[in-house]
């Protein structure tokens, strides 16, 4: 795959899908316009909900002057995401066994053309380190799911996707707890913004001899809450208390009666 490892952020984004570079790189492209000057993306406050991973997110931000004038350098939120239409079409065809190269060329490969990514074929090479969904998938369906994760990242689709795929096994992967690797370069980038480890620093976690930002401080690598059961209440969200009060015919979803 050409993956260079996680010694530095530069290594992580090298030789990868261009959308990863577009999403988290802040060293080679401007982030927004401020006082008519293109500025780089500051490292995120990794103690806040928007930056728990430690990676700076540049999605939905534009360094175009016209965007700054019109929308204060942010894109409008997608109400109708055409890319999701293309992705779900490809996925449905793959599930039905009707996904041909023509289908891929009309759907996923349209998205890949936008970023200069090589086309997906109906007979992709198997991933050597696949995500463990808890069951086997065809190589094609696996790649379509990965495409969905890449294209729609940070847009609010992931949890619903995992639920409808019955794929909560992915949370048992310890890598889901790990944020950015803490290296001297990262500590320098975060100087004045955050410190890592110690009594007052952001929580870190050791994994395979390396130190990482701990994304979810309430979750250890062996936390039993990472495992979902068939009757886990988290499959459904709790109904709002005010709605239950307004409509006495409504009953709370299973397992949430104490909330």
Each model region followed by its residue ranges:
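Acidic/polar-rich alpha-helix caps and helix-coil junctions
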Residues: 1-259
């Amino acid at each position: 795959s050409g993956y260079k490892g996680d010694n530095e952020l530069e290594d992580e984004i090298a030789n990868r899908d261009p959308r990863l570079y577009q999403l988290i790189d802040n060293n080679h492209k401007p982030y927004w316009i401020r006082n008519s000057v293109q500025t780089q993306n500051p490292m995120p406050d990794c103690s806040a909900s928007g930056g728990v991973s430690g990676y700076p997110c540049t999605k939905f931000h534009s360094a175009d002057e016209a965007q700054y004038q019109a929308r204060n350098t942010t894109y409008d939120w997608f109400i109708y995401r055409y890319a999701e239409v293309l992705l779900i079409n490809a996925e449905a065809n793959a599930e039905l066994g009707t996904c041909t190269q023509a289908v891929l060329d009309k759907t996923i490969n349209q998205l890949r053309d936008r970023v200069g990514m090589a086309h997906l074929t109906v007979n992709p090479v198997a991933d050597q380190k696949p995500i463990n969904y808890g069951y086997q998938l065809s190589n094609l369906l696996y790649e379509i799911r990965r495409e969905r994760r890449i294209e729609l990242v940070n847009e609010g689709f992931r949890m619903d996707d995992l639920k409808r795929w019955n794929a909560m096994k992915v949370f048992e992967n310890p890598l889901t707890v790990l944020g950015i690797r803490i290296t001297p370069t990262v500590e320098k980038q975060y100087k004045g913004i955050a410190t890592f480890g110690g009594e007052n620093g952001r929580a870190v976690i050791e994994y395979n001899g390396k130190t990482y930002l701990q994304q979810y401080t309430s979750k250890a690598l062996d936390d039993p809450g990472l495992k979902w059961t068939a009757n886990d209440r988290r499959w459904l969200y709790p109904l709002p208390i005010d709605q239950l009060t307004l409509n006495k015919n409504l009953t709370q979803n299973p397992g949430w009666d104490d909330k």
